[in-house]
Amino acid sequence: MALVTLRRNLYHLSDFRIHGALAALKTQQVNHVHKTVKEHLCPWFWSQHPGPIRVRFHHAHCKKFHSENGNDLHPVGEPGFSQVHNWDRFEHSVKNVDEQMFYRKLNSFTSSGEILRFVSTLETLPDTMMAGALHRICEVERKDGDQRLPKEILESSAFQALCDRFGRDPSDLSNAGLVTAFQALTLLCGDPQSHLLMNLEAECQHRLERGGLDVHSLCILGETLIKLHGPGCSTLDLIIYQLQGESLETFTPEDIVTVYRLLQASPEKADQQQRFLNKINHFSLSLVSNLSPKLMSQMLTALVVLDQTQALPLVIKLSKYVVRHIARFTSEELRKVLEALIYFGHSDRFFTETLEQHVASLCLTLDPELVSRVMEYCSRKLILSEPIFNAVAETFVCQAEKFSPSQTAKLIEPFGKLNYLPPNASALFRKLENMLLTRFNHFPPKTLLRLLHSCSLIESHPVNFMAKIFSPYFLQQLQGAESYLDRLSLAQLTQLFLTSILECPFYKGPKLLPKFQVKSFLTPCSSLETPMDFHLYKSVMIGLIDLLGARLYFSSKVLTPYCYTIDVEIKLDEDGFVLPFTIDEDVHKRVALCIDGPKRFCLNSKHLLGKEATKQRHLRLLGYQVVQIPYYEIEMLKSRLELVDYLQGKLFSQNSGGHW
């Protein structure tokens, strides 16, 4: 193993920052260069805990350790060392350094200056330890978000001494030391034309072409080249080719996730690598229980980017383990998990219950982007979770200024879609109105229209903004560069206009011009009306024929002059007798049967969606007698006779005055 001699007269350095590192030494076994001489070690170098010392640093000798969020770098189950600044006492060569203790001490530092001062007290170190020190600098500095080290640090003698050995003779370096140093210096320096990086890259390329790199080194090299040259780097194909030839049993969980990230860098090539992906997807099922929250999030993200819809068993298993560790996810990681579950269309009761507890416990500290993603997840899956909705409403009322226009829309829209008013509804919509009054022009036109339309679904009518959205100026903005307005926007405008007539008679502002009004609210995306459940309709139709005597006495899928489509319409004369549907004279009352299948309700509930509740409310205001026939009542009927009795009770109760 190559030893690196360091100059000991290094300058003291101030803290500095970089953008984060990606991975570290994992697979190559590193032997101690010399035995530890315990009696010569400084007292503070020893653990205060009995048992073997385990170091939470990505290093070949310490395979059980990983940094789960980039900030949590203490050994598993043990507290981190307190900071000690008596650096002059540590004047020993590597023969007095126990490797595990070296990494334990290294991981206790929180700034680059401390790391460099610590390493400067050592006369010689193995190349893997030196590379580990560089990597640790990446770990401690990436939390501040800067992408590069300051110039004064890069040019300092301390940093140059640390880098000098790697550039002088890279051929003497171990594989693990080489690729880890290359990775760390790429992140710290970032200049592809750097003489040092060019030397290290050339040596990596040489060993790659000889087939001399192990799995973990290939993974680190691949991610480093993507960082340095972008996903179009030609060498990446050779790395993936060599990884395909390795047995998956030799891959660690971190390696598997890194392979996903390598493939994710070129999603357009996913079809070419599908056989390899299928193998990885299947093998990953056995690794899920060993993944950290960070790795789970990264794996799910890669599955989305690579469009691995056939890997649903893996997605389901990952979601089960997310439930167990949800409190350990960062906001960004949990957001990625939710995006993946939305993409694959997966949800389950246990995840929802755990998410409810998590969101409720963090009510006023939730990240705005995470809040909007949680609400989008509930909206897409039609999950009406009162604990989540109440917590989110409270968060918005207290911290509305933190939410962007798009985040605000994603937060509010599910309340209308799922037909739910939180306990603090008045405060919620007052806060929203104030935001719109002050930031109206910051909302994109379509986002604003969706937001206001959602409010109207739960009878929080945006009267103060109707004049603006019906104005020619707004309609022109809404259309943008297109030659016409899309059908969904026109339908939303039309329903808002109908709402202004039926529910806001005091509104006296501009009307929506006829050319912007649709004839039917049925749209391809079913955003304003849900099509009738055909199988449920067939059952009800049989019962109606038995009850009324003939198919002649009711019509189905009737488009009204008010844009709504009625599932079944029955006409009654003044005496309450049923008329044939072909007769339009002497019609005294129209009965609208709403045959509500499961898709018209929130998931696993009897709570109507906002669009369906609005439709029934409007039909009543238009003079229809609305009769709801929900699927869960039909499913309880055991015979045709029970169905007829049920329909008779619904249609011709004592108060309805109807006859047949």
UniProtKB/Swiss-Prot annotation:
Which terms does the UniProt entry file under GO BP? mitochondrial cytochrome c oxidase assembly; mitochondrial RNA processing; positive regulation of mitochondrial translation; regulation of mitochondrial mRNA stability
Q: Sorted alphabetically, which keywords does the UniProt record give?
A: Mitochondrion, Transit peptide
Give GO MF terms, alphabetically: RNA binding
Read off the Pfam families from this record. Answer: FAST_1, FAST_2, RAP
The RAP domain, residue ranges: 591-649
Q: Where in the sequence is the transit peptide found? A: 1-57
Q: Where in the cell is it found?
A: Mitochondrion
**Can you quote a single GO CC term?**
mitochondrial matrix
Q: Which domain of life is it from?
A: Eukaryota
Family classification: Belongs to the FAST kinase family.
Q: What is known of its domains?
A: RAP domain is required for FASTKD3 function in mRNA stability and translation.
The record describes the protein's role as: Required for normal mitochondrial respiration. Increases steady-state levels and half-lives of a subset of mature mitochondrial mRNAs MT-ND2, MT-ND3, MT-CYTB, MT-CO2, and MT-ATP8/6. Promotes MT-CO1 mRNA translation and increases mitochondrial complex IV assembly and activity.
* Name of protein: FAST kinase domain-containing protein 3, mitochondrial
- Organism equals Bos taurus
